């Protein structure tokens, strides 16, 4: 849901795609293979096994920056990417990347996208400082989001250059990229939940990390071979449309026919799971403030609210079948993402300051390290109210039910087939407003109890 770069794929003019007549299908296929596998290799090395990588950048210790002098093995791994893949990136990137970023630079969504990245890196930097007591798995999850950001750029380019449409209209690519966001939210939520149940923020869950990387590899592989090898079309459903009902299933009951770009059940399920997991993560962050005896963590819950609204904006756009007359929703989504990245960065900075963070180069490294070690104390253990199995069952049931209700329920309404801007804005504003009201009441109750 916190779609930092989803807008790069959901906006843009189809006419600009048609200008790219000099880019052959073979070049596009090579670009699809090369860009994804190269980006995946870099991303996994830089972030996947080191959630504090953005923090290391600010300290001049980033593993990629020092690979040539101190990590020759890491450099060798990157060189293992085949020459064909690299050449594919070189051949097609000038046309493809120019299209994506030139097109985005000319609209509001693109400007928001560009402005979103730096504050998110700042957020990761503050969140991963030694004294913040951020659960390690959650820190890994927030860093894993960058893999989703990277993935949406090539998938968006593939959507435009191969199919001539936006990523939102290419269901199999759309669902694949969105799956990385779902994985991100699961990592974040599980990290906070484990920390509170075990009483320590040091839990790693190495197996879960490996599964996350494996899913990222599957997404990369699918994007690389989906069109040139498997022959996937623009509207090929994600996961073969698992769970989709026949197109005329409700025709006798007066239901309208779905447009060709309607989301499949798996893609809708991925969207709803991301929304619900993010809401759950916000609640866990709020509770973590009490467990860690650090009330500044509650500010992060508030900082996450615009990112929740961004996810709702994306779902609203899909509810209206990505109607181009409602393209302002894409800009709104991008703006909310940009705002949310600033608010979580500010919240993380408050957490860091409350736990002894000092401006780099103006404080003793030894003192900062000693202070960080002192902060690695046990949290107040808080056993979960329900088992993992029950929680997963509830989330799965809510996700699948929501996917079916929206996908097939909207066929009985006229609203999704109209460009009703007022209704769209109301749909975007209502869930975040209700969530804000909920936390205002919790804050008021806590003040009264104190």
Where are these regions (language model features)?
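N-terminal plastid-targeting presequences
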Residues: 66-450
């Amino acid at each position: 849901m916190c779609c930092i770069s989803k807008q790069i794929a959901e906006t843009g003019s189809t006419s600009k795609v048609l200008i790219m007549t000099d880019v052959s299908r073979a070049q596009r296929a090579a670009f699809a293979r090369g860009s994804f596998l190269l980006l995946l290799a870099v991303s996994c090395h830089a972030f996947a096994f080191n959630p504090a990588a953005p923090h290391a950048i600010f300290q001049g210790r980033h593993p990629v920056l020092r690979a040539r002098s101190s990590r020759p093995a890491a450099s060798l791994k990157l060189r293992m990417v085949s020459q064909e893949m690299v050449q594919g990136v070189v051949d097609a990137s000038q046309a493809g990347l120019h299209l994506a970023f030139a097109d985005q630079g000319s609209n509001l969504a693109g400007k928001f996208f560009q402005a979103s990245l730096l504050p998110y890196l700042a957020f990761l930097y503050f969140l991963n400082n030694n004294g913040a007591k951020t659960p390690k798995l959650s820190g890994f999850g927030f860093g894993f989001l960058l893999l989703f950001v990277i993935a949406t750029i090539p998938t968006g380019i593939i959507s435009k250059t191969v199919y001539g449409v936006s990523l939102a209209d290419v269901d199999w690519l759309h669902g694949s990229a969105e799956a990385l966001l779902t994985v991100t939210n699961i990592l974040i939520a599980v990290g906070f939940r484990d920390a509170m149940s075990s009483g320590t923020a040091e839990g790693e869950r190495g197996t879960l990390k490996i599964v996350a990387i494996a899913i990222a590899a599957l997404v990369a592989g699918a994007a690389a071979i989906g069109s040139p090898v498997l022959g996937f079309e623009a509207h090929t459903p994600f996961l073969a449309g698992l769970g989709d009902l026949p197109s005329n299933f409700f025709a006798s009951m007066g239901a309208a026919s779905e447009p060709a770009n309607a989301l499949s059940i798996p893609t809708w399920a991925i969207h709803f799971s991301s929304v619900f997991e993010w809401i759950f993560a916000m609640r866990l962050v709020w509770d973590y403030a009490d467990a860690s005896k650090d009330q500044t963590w509650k500010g992060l819950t508030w900082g996450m609210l615009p990112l929740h609204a961004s996810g709702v904006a994306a779902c609203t756009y899909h509810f209206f079948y990505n109607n181009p007359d409602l393209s302002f929703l894409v800009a709104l989504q991008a703006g909310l993402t940009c705002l949310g990245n600033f608010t979580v960065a500010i919240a993380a900075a408050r957490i860091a300051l409350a736990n002894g963070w000092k401006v780099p180069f103006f404080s003793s490294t030894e003192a900062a390290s000693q202070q960080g070690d002192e902060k690695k104390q046990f949290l107040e253990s808080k056993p979960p109210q329900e088992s993992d199995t029950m929680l997963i069952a509830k989330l799965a049931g809510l996700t699948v039910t929501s996917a079916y209700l929206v996908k097939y329920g909207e066929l009985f309404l006229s609203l999704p087939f109209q460009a009703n801007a007022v209704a769209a804005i109301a749909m975007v504003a209502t869930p975040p407003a209700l969530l804000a009201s909920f936390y205002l009441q919790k804050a008021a109750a806590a003040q009264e109890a104190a």
